[in-house]
A protein has these predicted regions:
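Short, solvent-exposed secondary-structure boundary/capping segments
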Residues: 41, 120-126
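Structural motif
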Residues: 84-85, 99
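Short, compositionally biased
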Residues: 97-121
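Flexible, small-/acidic-enriched active-site or ligand-binding loops
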Residues: 128-134
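Hydrophobic beta-strand signal
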Residues: 88-89, 102
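Short, positionally conserved secondary-structure boundary motifs
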Residues: 1-77, 108-109, 116, 142-144, ...
Length: 157
C-alpha cells in the first residue's frame, strides 16, 4: 500500500518518503564488531550472525518517515550532523527535550536540538558560534519531525 501524501509541504532538500512499497534488502550482518582502537587478535574468525535490513533497522513508522538532506553550514557538527548528511525524520514521534528535530522557524525548516529551560523551548545548534533560538512564550513551536538516524558517505571519491 503506497504511503499517503504528507499533510505539510516537504521542505527543500527532502528526498521524499522513506517508504513507498515494502522492499527488503537484507545484507549479512557480521557477528564481530569493528574495533575503533587496536583490533583484537582473538577475532581471527568471524561469521554471519544475522541479516540486516536497513528498512527494519532505521524505520519505525514507514508512512511517517522521510529522508532529508542536511543543508550547508556547520551548526550541527557538534551533534555529528554534517552538510550533505542524509537525515531520517519520523513525523509520528513526539519530540522530547534532547531530541534532534526538524522545526519550522521563521518560515523555514531548521535542524536543531530541542531543549526546555524555565518552561520554555529552545532550539540549540551543536556549534558554540551559534546562539540558541529562544522560543518566545507567545509563539507556538512547530516540530515537523524527529531525526532518528543520520547517514554519511565516508568514501569521498
Amino acid at each position: 500500500m503506497p504511503a499517503p501524501a504528507p499533510t505539510l509541504p516537504l521542505p527543500p532538500g527532502t528526498v521524499g518518503p522513506a517508504y513507498i512499497e515494502p522492499t527488503h534488502l537484507a545484507l549479512p550482518l557480521l557477528s564481530v564488531r569493528a574495533a575503533c582502537g587496536f583490533p583484537s587478535p582473538a577475532e581471527d574468525f568471524f561469521g554471519v550472525e544475522d541479516l540486516l535490513d536497513l528498512n527494519q533497522r532505521c524505520i519505525d513508522n514507514p508512512v511517517a518517515t522521510f529522508f532529508m538532506e542536511a543543508d550547508t553550514g556547520e551548526s550541527m557538527v557538534g551533534f555529528g550532523i554534517y552538510p550533505g548528511d542524509t537525515l531520517v525524520v519520523d513525523r509520528s514521534r513526539n519530540a522530547q527535550p534532547g531530541d534532534i528535530v526538524i522545526a519550522i522557524w521563521e518560515g523555514g525548516f531548521v535542524c536543531k536540538q530541542l531543549r526546555k529551560r524555565a518552561g520554555r523551548f529552545e532550539l540549540h545548534s551543536g556549534h558554540p558560534d551559534h546562539a540558541p533560538i529562544q522560543v518566545p512564550p507567545d509563539v507556538e513551536l512547530e516540530v515537523w519531525g524527529v531525526v532518528t538516524w543520520t547517514f554519511r558517505k565516508q568514501l569521498r571519491r
